[in-house]
């Protein structure tokens, strides 16, 4: 059984109490032990570090931020009552516009925003401290630094560099290493001081920076974990397993599993991945014993009011819950049978015809007994 079995929700539904309660109940019913909620700019919605702008107090913004912290702390306490750990996930660095207006030297004509590592590591420290203090019941934070969604990436992806860029303005790996190391050290120290668990998500804006990021993480205390995607970039069945998963041997590794199907219609159409997922998870465990956790993403941050348990592709999420727990030895057929029985109250082996032809009414046209409409797990039949 995997040590960390996490369920993640990362769209606007995290602010809907009914939706997050459904997430918690789903996790409890299916053997998950960790809840992750997140958005790219989440931390900026929760706190505004003091002393960086002349606008020390904005009643509207402050009230909204405080309300969100109270809400998430309530969710963290609910998770604790259900025996679940609770993490927040976000992408940094992010900041409000007035920060640049108050520190105009950060605006560089050649490179856009100046990466003053002393300033930004201090800003990051104060922001993360505020998040931990505002939501004391949380277990830890999952942070991606310098992703394409951050306002201040340390390096840019190749597609974002045009022919007019001067070569001398491109940041070299040795320079990037120093920036990553300083920021990671700042994150590690502040999260540890708040008695929380830090998970660094290896998700740089440029894939060329992957080795630099891993090198900068290596000197950190072993209590800092890392999160790495199952495939090198996005998801497609033919993509290889991510070799970066094998490069971390001094700390726990959590593998990111995209079950929302960004590249295949977000799970709207059935997309069977059970055998593929089983093979990849077995590879993880055999290839690197430090891979101890998995984060199953149930949504995609750009599509609201949608998550995998409301689609036919839920079979993949259900299979993951089994494969990460005590069902690792089950076959795809057995896992599908279990899912159909739970979701539809239907046992395919009770019928002589094949499961999917029966489900579609193929064959002799005889009606199937019972109601095959999906049963809600969260309300009585």
Located regions from the model:
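Non-catalytic positions within long, well-ordered alpha-helices that form the structural scaffold/packing
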Residues: 28-29, 285-287
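Extended ligand-binding clefts on enzyme/binding-domain cores
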Residues: 212-256, 267, 279, 285-286, ...
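A broad structural signal for short, well-ordered beta-strand segments within beta-sheet-rich domains
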Residues: 138, 291, 347-348
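Aromatic-lined carbohydrate-binding surfaces of glycoside hydrolases
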Residues: 1-238, 264-268, 298-326, 358, ...
